[in-house]
Amino acid sequence: EMQQKNEDTAASDTGENSIQVFERVEQYLTSNLVQAPEVADSSVSVLIADTMAAEPNVRYWQRMINIGPAVNLLRYDVRAQVQFLKEKLDFEYMRIWQIFSEEMLIQLGEHNVKYNFMLLDQVLDFLVNLKIKPHIEFGFKKHTYFEKVDRSILKIYKDHSLIRLMQNKGFLEDLIKHWTTRYGTAEVETWYIELEKNSVIQETISLEQYFEVFETVYAIFKNYAPGIQIGGAGFSLNVIGKSFEDILRQWKKRKYQPDFVSIYSYPYNYQNKIVDEQRNEYASNESYLADVIYEAHAQMKMAGMTDIPLLVTEWSSTLSNRNCLNDSCYKSAYMVKNMIENYGKVPTLGYWVATDIFSEGIDLNTFLSGGCGLITQNDICKPAYFAMEFMNHLEPYIIGKNENAIVSSRKDGVYFICCHNYKHLNFRYYSRNENEIEIENQQRYFSDNESLQMSFRIRHMNHGKYIVKIFFIGPTHGNVQNEWKQLGYLESLSIYETDYLKRHCQPELSVFYVEAKNNELVIETHIAAQEIQGIVVAEV
């Protein structure tokens, strides 16, 4: 409501809008060093979990992660990070795109086709040898990254390249034959093939053309590897809105239905005519991902497509790879909040994107660039990485959850809790371009700075003493941005300084003991704003 007010009230006669007035007041306060006091009292959250109510843990966030254009996987530094991510976070699938490109030695013209599978083999061999399943995006996704998101990016694509797949049936046949021969049909049948239709940036290809391309690929591939999963179309509900249902209805009438329907989630408003021109396109909705999933399921139901799984193949808090919030603990809290909030709703949630190497550019000479990756170019784990790591520590059974936490157990009296104190962005954020947010002033963009007192009551516990170990990543610990600040935002880091940061970007740990009484164990913890915690509980 606050936000509405600020946007609607025109300010005084000077013609300034309320946000500008606010900015001036704030600049005055900042320059005169008036600090808003940290709110003393924190809000309280209680979660009751029950060991008798255990359900198997479905690790849908661990199923797939976006890696980048196939050509990146020929690089040593990217491979090293992929190996690290497989070893530490054990993703089952990795999603790659742009496998049909001249850099990959595959040239699909309208009439003349030249191709050599040598480089593609190197990429897929690398993944398969690491026991990573490929999730391959066949659409011609451009290798672009954005500094900020505005309407101009909707006009980038004018390429009908998807149709080239239809014109090259012989090539598709060679490709799938080559794969089944090289990797064996059983292996290839575990792969996912996705065909993007209208990504965040709309392509100029009609629905009819899309269906024809999809059916061409589907028929040829299923002929050689019947079990391979082929779906699409990378829908962004913020772009197509209600027409999603109509597209699905038409798809249902076609010869082949997709094995899965895929959507993307990036919180932007494209449809709404944003009245106040001072605003960026960011959607202010705090549960954006949950709403998109809910809406997509609702429309799939109306279209009679309830038996087809819905996959979120890309999700992030932003499309910008020059937004310093990507490097901050805001991002880790955002991720944990969303992974808990959407638990059990979709089989796959593919985070965008694994590494900052994806978003390199000529403008990049800073140590932290505001990229969407889990890891920096110099192999330092960002708070976003620890969001995944903490969630991965959840035990095989889930015994309780609420909006701030999820509690898990295993058979032998070991428990793991993952919790967060996410703070949403406020109206100031919407008046800024994403690449203009100052690393020192992030605080100004959050709804509040209150800490959270959480209390977990776990029922049906054995009597006796338990050890509690709390790992935390937050504004002052394990946070690469904060550690870099201690080094005076030094631009060019030596190997020694990079190693120093690697050692310091780790969760902090505190340990204490609690006693279970009346078959109930109560654990209390205090969580700072934008902090995440992983809590291990074990019988002593």
Regions inferred by a protein language model and the residue ranges of each:
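C-terminal beta-sandwich/jelly-roll accessory domains of carbohydrate-active enzymes
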Residues: 6, 12, 22-29, 33, ...
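Short, solvent-exposed loop/turn elements at domain surfaces
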Residues: 58, 71-75, 104-105, 271, ...
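Glycoside hydrolase catalytic-domain groove-lining segments
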Residues: 81, 268-323, 338, 344-356, ...
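Substrate-binding cleft and catalytic face of glycoside hydrolase catalytic domains
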Residues: 89-282
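Aromatic/acidic polysaccharide-binding cleft in carbohydrate-active enzymes
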Residues: 312-438
